[in-house]
């Protein structure tokens, strides 16, 4: 093991392969500073991290992140509040790989290009694999803000973004939004495979199932959407629309697993990535405590009011919970 001093004067441990080991909010800040000098730096998360009110994001417009970040099934909790474009834990990526990471928390912005994992993808071939977004994302811009449950925007000829085996549980409040990628522009390519979204979107005038596109190119394979209001039909994409009954009966988990030898998807209340079920059957959703019941109106994932005896995933006071 080695200790490396970053620009923030916090020493980050590295393993024998040179991966930076990220286990605290201070490590996150220090790694962001390292990326500003060495954009191809690789990292492994070693613990769940709550950033609190820390506004640090990795990658800048001038120096996008280009390395491999492995969350190792850990959770990153964010609370970003910004007044400028491009927001996500990874603000800009170009030729990066992000895998096995669960992001939850809050993103509030008065502008656009907000994503649960990534703000903007301007170049390179990029990979997001086995990740989960449970972020509450709100943009007050009022139009053309391009908010995505995973990525805000993807742009430029030759830019490729692959999203494989990912689960979107985001709650989005924005006028123009999509389950996975807010917008892809001008000959960029977005490919979404073996993925599921149970995201919700409020205040949307343009909400699409996978992504919006303007002269971009995209493919969608074996990807399922619970809430699909494709209101921007000339520039939208289609996944397979499913019902809560299908999510509950295990058939979609089987379809997502797709006869692979390695177990990637398992069945819980909804299909779940296996890596997030290893410890304490973690689903990324809190359970409602019967001893401390919530006081708001309770809805199912189709937006229909349900009683307090309803079992499964519910939305109450703008948050998703599990009632067992």
Place the predicted regions along the sequence by residue.
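Extracellular Ig-like/FN3 beta-sandwich strand-entry sites
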Residues: 309-311
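Bacterial N-terminal signal peptides
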Residues: 1-6
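C-terminal tail/sorting-segment detector
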Residues: 313-324
């Amino acid at each position: 093991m080695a200790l490396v001093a970053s620009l923030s004067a916090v020493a980050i441990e590295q393993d024998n392969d040179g991966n930076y080991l990220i286990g605290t909010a201070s490590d996150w800040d220090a790694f962001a500073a390292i990326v500003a000098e060495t954009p191809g730096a690789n990292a492994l998360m070693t613990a769940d991290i709550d950033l609190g009110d820390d506004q640090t994001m990795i990658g800048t417009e001038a120096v996008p992140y280009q390395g491999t970040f492995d969350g190792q099934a850990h959770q990153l909790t964010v609370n970003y509040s910004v007044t400028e474009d491009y927001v996500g834990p990874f603000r800009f990526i170009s030729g990066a790989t992000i895998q096995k990471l669960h992001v939850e928390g809050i993103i509030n912005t008065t502008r656009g290009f907000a994503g649960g994992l990534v703000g903007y993808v301007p170049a390179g071939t990029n990979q997001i694999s086995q990740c989960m977004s449970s972020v509450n994302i709100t943009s007050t811009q009022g139009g053309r803000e391009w908010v995505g449950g995973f990525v805000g925007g993807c742009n430029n000829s030759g830019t490729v973004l692959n999203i494989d085996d990912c689960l979107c549980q985001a709650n989005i409040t924005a006028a123009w939004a999509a389950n996975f990628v807010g917008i892809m522009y001008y000959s960029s390519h977005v490919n979404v495979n073996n993925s599921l979204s149970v995201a919700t979107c409020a205040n949307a005038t343009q909400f699409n199932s996978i992504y919006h596109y303007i002269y971009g190119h995209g493919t969608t394979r074996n990807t399922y959407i619970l809430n699909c209001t494709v209101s921007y039909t000339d520039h939208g994409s289609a996944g397979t629309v499913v019902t809560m009954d299908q999510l509950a009966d295990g058939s979609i988990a089987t379809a997502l697993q797709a006869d692979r030898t390695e177990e990637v998807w398992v069945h819980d209340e909804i299909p779940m990535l296996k890596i997030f079920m290893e410890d304490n059957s973690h689903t990324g959703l809190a359970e409602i405590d019967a001893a401390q019941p919530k006081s708001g109106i309770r809805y199912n994932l189709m937006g229909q009011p349900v009683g307090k005896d309803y079992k499964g995933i519910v939305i109450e006071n703008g948050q998703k919970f599990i009632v067992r």
